[in-house]
C-alpha cells in the first residue's frame, strides 16, 4: 500500500488557486496526496486527471478515489505525453497543472524496484516497468566517459572519475547485478574522509543513474513547456523540485516565459508571440516549514515554484 508523506501539500494545491468547477491535472499521482486534497476542493463540475507510469499507483488511486466517479480520471503514462493524452480525452485546455518531481516513497522503499541504496536488490530504477533501459544496463554497458558525465552532471558527484574507474575495473570480471554491489564500489571510489560527510556516499550516483534511466530532465523540460501551453489564461502551474538541476529548468523556463525579449526600438505594439505567457506567482521558491521538516525528512530539499498564465 502507498503510505507516502506528501510534501508541501497545501502550498502546492492552494497555489493553483482552485476553481471548484475547473479541470486540473496532477502529473505525478504517486501516493495520491496532492490529488486527494485537490479533489476535496472540487464541486460536481470539477475534475482531476492524474498521470503516473506506475500501475500500482494507478490501481491504488482508483480504489482510494472511487467515490469521485467520473471526476477522477487516471492516465498510465509518462507526463512527457501530457498534451497528447489530454487531447485524446478531448481536453484542449485546463485550469491548473501540478508536478511533484520527488520519487514517491513507496518506490524508494520497495527493495525490488532498485531505487534505494539502503536495500540490496536488482539494479532496476525504472519508473515505468515496461521501459527497456534499466540501471543494470547503464552500470554494465555504458562507457567510462558516459558514466563520468552522468555522475558529474546529474549527481554533482566530485569523485565521478574515481567511481567510474572502480565500476569499469569490477565489471571486466563480473557483471554488477545488485544495488549492494554498486554501493560498495561507490564507497571504494570515494576517499574515506569524504565518505563521512554529506549523507550517504551513494546518494549522488544513485540519483544520477535514476535520472539517466528515466531521462528525467529532458522529459520534465518538455512536459513543463506543454503544461504552459495547456493551461488557460488565469490558470496556474505548480512545480515541486528536489534538486538543483530540476529547479534550474523550472526557474529558467518560468523566467523565459514571463519576460519580454529584446525587440527593435520603435515598434508601435508588441506582437502577440513576443508577449510574456506567464506571470510569476513565486519570485523565490517556497520551502517546507520547520514543522514539515521535523515530520518528513524527505522534504528537506523540496522547492515549490508557481506561475500563472497571462
From Swiss-Prot:
GO terms for biological process: rRNA base methylation. Its main location: cytoplasm. GO terms for molecular function: rRNA (cytosine-N4-)-methyltransferase activity. It is found in: Cytoplasm. Keywords: Cytoplasm, Methyltransferase, rRNA processing, S-adenosyl-L-methionine, Transferase. S-adenosyl-L-methionine binds at residues 32-34, 52, 79, 100, 107. Gene3D superfamilies: Putative methyltransferase TM0872, insert domain, Vaccinia Virus protein VP39. It is an enzyme of class 2 (transferase). Its EC number is 2.1.1.199. The keyword Lipoprotein does not apply. The keyword 4Fe-4S does not apply. It catalyses: cytidine(1402) in 16S rRNA + S-adenosyl-L-methionine = N(4)-methylcytidine(1402) in 16S rRNA + S-adenosyl-L-homocysteine + H(+). GO terms for cellular component: cytoplasm. InterPro entries: RsmH, SAM-dep_MeTrfase_MraW_recog, SAM-dependent_MTases_sf. Specifically methylates the N4 position of cytidine in position 1402 (C1402) of 16S rRNA. Belongs to the methyltransferase superfamily. RsmH family. This is Ribosomal RNA small subunit methyltransferase H. It comes from Bacillus cereus (strain AH187). The lineage of its organism: Bacteria, Bacillati, Bacillota, Bacilli, Bacillales. The gene is rsmH.
